[in-house]
């Protein structure tokens, strides 16, 4: 069996057009572009590249991006003050924190100063709680992109058995909740799960978010299953691979996302969708 490739790049182009139209409508309603503030602490090259990519995406869709670059030695109080100022700024519609924060800084303190209605990552305790209650408003972008990929490619989630490999607060847990809300029967697997393969072989949908290259092999996958790979692991030679042994699993699965080019492109569009939602909700549009 050769799996159908769930092409995130192609889907992202379709979603870009939808987002651009919605942003154009918002611009006429608020007489300015919807604006995202991206807060980066330190000068990690990968983080800097990502901020630039968000800036380019905003410009291409008609939104605005304000990048706030803070030195790595920024004190906790100063970071919290920056986030509080952005939260109070009426011309900032959404805030994105570049994670993880450098050593010595704690996320909980920063989130306490972040306006939940501007939380574009969906990680504020209020937004996480709403998601857990089945009333999501701003949903974490990466898992939202995985669900959108399945929905747009016509993959039925209702009534299916699903496994999420990984339990992070940004990807694994919210992905499990989104699958549950789509009426899947969900199992969360992690580093303490005995015999991971035995669990996965029973599942129609596998979402991999463990951060371990090649963790999921072909013998772990039920024939015809849908495999969503959130992994972004950079190898010593600079290449990027997912958590799934793509070539081998693609011969068994019914559908699979590649890395790169699968969930990643859709994740960024989900960020823009959250910006649109945040702007509309905050301004009562």
Swiss-Prot record:
Keyword Hydrolase: yes
Any one Gene Ontology molecular-function term assigned to this protein's record: methylenetetrahydrofolate dehydrogenase (NADP+) activity
Associated pathway: One-carbon metabolism; tetrahydrofolate interconversion
Reactions that this protein is recorded to catalyse: (6R)-5,10-methylene-5,6,7,8-tetrahydrofolate + NADP(+) = (6R)-5,10-methenyltetrahydrofolate + NADPH; (6R)-5,10-methenyltetrahydrofolate + H2O = (6R)-10-formyltetrahydrofolate + H(+)
UniProt-listed Enzyme Commission number(s): 1.5.1.5, 3.5.4.9
GO annotation, biological process: L-histidine biosynthetic process; methionine biosynthetic process; purine nucleotide biosynthetic process; tetrahydrofolate interconversion
Binding site for NADP(+): 166-168, 191, 232
SUPFAM superfamilies: Aminoacid dehydrogenase-like, N-terminal domain (SSF53223), NAD(P)-binding Rossmann-fold domains (SSF51735)
Functional note: Catalyzes the oxidation of 5,10-methylenetetrahydrofolate to 5,10-methenyltetrahydrofolate and then the hydrolysis of 5,10-methenyltetrahydrofolate to 10-formyltetrahydrofolate.
Protein family membership: Belongs to the tetrahydrofolate dehydrogenase/cyclohydrolase family.
PANTHER family: C-1-TETRAHYDROFOLATE SYNTHASE, CYTOPLASMIC, C-1-TETRAHYDROFOLATE SYNTHASE, CYTOPLASMIC-RELATED
Record protein name field: Bifunctional protein FolD
């Amino acid at each position: 069996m050769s799996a159908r490739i769930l092409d995130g790049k192609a889907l992202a182009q379709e979603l870009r057009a939808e987002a651009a139209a919605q942003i154009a409508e918002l611009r006429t309603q608020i007489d300015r572009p919807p604006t995202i503030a991206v807060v980066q602490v330190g000068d990690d090259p990968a983080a800097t590249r990502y901020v630039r990519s968000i800036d380019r995406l905003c410009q291409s869709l008609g939104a605005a991006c304000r990048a706030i670059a803070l030195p790595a030695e920024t004190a906790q109080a100063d970071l919290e003050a920056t986030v509080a100022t952005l939260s109070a700024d009426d011309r900032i519609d959404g805030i994105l924190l570049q994670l993880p924060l450098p050593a010595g800084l704690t996320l909980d303190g920063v989130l306490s100063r972040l306006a939940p209605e501007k939380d574009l990552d969906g990680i504020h305790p209020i937004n996480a709680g709403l998601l857990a209650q089945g009333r999501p408003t701003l949903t974490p972008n990466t898992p939202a992109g995985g669900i959108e990929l399945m929905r747009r490619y016509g993959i039925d989630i209702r009534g299916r058995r699903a496994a999420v490999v990984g339990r992070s607060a940004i990807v694994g847990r919210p992905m499990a909740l989104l699958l549950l809300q789509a009426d899947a029967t969900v199992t969360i697997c992690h580093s303490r799960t005995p015999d991971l393969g035995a669990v996965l072989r029973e599942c129609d949908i596998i979402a991999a978010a463990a951060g371990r290259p090649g963790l999921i092999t072909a013998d772990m996958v039920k024939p015809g299953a849908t495999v969503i790979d959130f992994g972004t692991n950079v190898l010593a030679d600079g290449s990027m691979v997912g958590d799934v042994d793509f070539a081998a699993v693609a011969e068994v699965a019914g559908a699979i996302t590649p890395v790169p080019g699968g969930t990643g492109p859709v994740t960024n569009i989900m960020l823009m969708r959250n910006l649109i939602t945040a702007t509309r909700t905050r301004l009562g549009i």
